[in-house]
From Swiss-Prot:
Belongs to the UbiC family. The gene is ubiC. Keywords: Cytoplasm, Lyase, Pyruvate, Ubiquinone biosynthesis. This is Probable chorismate pyruvate-lyase. It is found in: Cytoplasm. Substrate binds at R77, L115, E174. It comes from the Bacteria.
């Protein structure tokens, strides 16, 4: 895996839109994946023999435009979700400092364990709304895909999922790389 042309954090400022606006969504079957209410990790695991989380970086960082405007720093975790050694999803998680100390979740000790397993295994984390974004062929996400030897021929898609814990909110952004979009149409509709 060669991602030397970029450095952590890989994320970029993104214009997200409400998933209810279906005229802006891609064609099926990718649309169903973007709007899937359950764990994306579980859905991905159903399409492969070997699932792997590759950590690109994690640590305290200032949020980007459109992310936590009232926070000066949040915990950022960026990973690749790989199926049978092929990166399918770039995921960026943002956790406010107040949630890092919760006893119900060991965010800092996740290592290569999927975050989805933690969030969907505990009733104290409630899945919330989903927002959608598209990424141009010259975006940082497209550059990341190209550094992974994935050809970016058209815009890419992603979703941002909010999770609530008591009065706190965190979110996970999951961007589908070209390999995922191609395989979803073939392997797991």
């Amino acid at each position: 895996m060669n991602v030397t042309s970029l450095s952590f954090p890989y994320g970029e400022s993104i214009q997200w839109f409400c998933a209810d606006n279906t005229k802006n969504l891609p064609a099926s079957p990718l649309k169903e994946w973007l709007l899937a209410p359950g764990s994306l990790t579980q859905k991905l695991k159903g399409c492969c023999n070997e699932f792997e989380v590759r950590i690109l970086g994690e640590g305290q960082c200032p949020p980007l435009d459109g992310e936590y405007p009232n926070q000066s720093a949040v915990w950022v975790r960026e990973v690749l979700l790989c199926l049978d050694d092929v990166p399918w999803v770039f995921a960026r998680t943002l956790i406010p400092q107040s949630l890092l100390s919760t006893r119900q979740a060991d965010f800092l000790g996740l290592g290569t364990r999927p975050l989805g397993e933690l969030l969907f295994s505990q009733d104290s984390f409630v899945p919330g709304r989903i927002e959608i974004a598209r990424f141009a062929t010259n975006s940082r996400l497209a550059h990341l895909a190209q550094s992974l030897a994935q050809n970016v021929e058209h815009e890419l898609w992603g979703r941002r999922r909010y999770f609530h814990h008591n009065e706190e909110e965190m979110f996970v952004s999951e961007m589908f790389l070209p390999a995922a979009e191609q395989a979803i149409a073939r392997l797991c509709p």
